[in-house]
């Protein structure tokens, strides 16, 4: 993994997260009460800038359209579960990047992966409580959406330019 590989990965992640937050977060404002505190696009922008990507380039990155996939609260919950769950492994990813790329390369450039810092565990527990309450009775659709989100992310990251 090189710094350029990491920047390319963050660029793709930015397109997905930005589109998800823009189009799906509004569906969750009544289910996930602290949804406003879970926006992370700005952290990806900070990471990209730290890696030398200028604002004009960031602004031109594709904004994935999600309204067709996440039309219901259940679908939005499934997608949110995947995105919030990814932060649980963030500290491991950040440590790996520091080891591979060097502390001087990654310092201040892995804000997304350490979004909640020492509060990661408590934020996850709070999310799970709200998630379990909101998904009661619609578990099948939530699970299907989570699986679809994994599939969409896989396609997003493996598409050809």
Give a label for each model feature.
Residues 1-161:
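Metal- and O2-centered redox machinery and metal/ROS homeostasis
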């Amino acid at each position: 993994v090189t710094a350029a590989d990491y920047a390319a990965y963050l660029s793709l992640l930015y397109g997905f997260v930005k589109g998800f937050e823009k189009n799906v977060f509004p569906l969750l404002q009544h289910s996930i009460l602290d949804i406003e505190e879970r926006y992370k696009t700005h952290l990806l922008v900070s990471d990209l800038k730290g890696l030398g990507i200028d604002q004009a380039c960031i602004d031109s990155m594709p904004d994935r359209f999600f309204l067709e996939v996440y039309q219901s609260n259940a679908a939005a919950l499934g997608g949110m579960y995947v995105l919030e769950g990814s932060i649980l492994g963030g500290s491991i990813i950040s440590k790996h990047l520091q080891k591979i790329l060097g502390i001087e390369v990654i310092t201040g450039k892995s804000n997304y992966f350490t979004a909640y810092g020492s509060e990661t565990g408590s934020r996850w527990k709070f999310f799970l409580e709200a998630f379990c309450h909101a998904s009661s009775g619609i578990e099948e659709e939530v699970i299907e959406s989570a699986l679809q989100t994994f599939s969409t992310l896989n396609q997003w990251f493996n598409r050809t330019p």
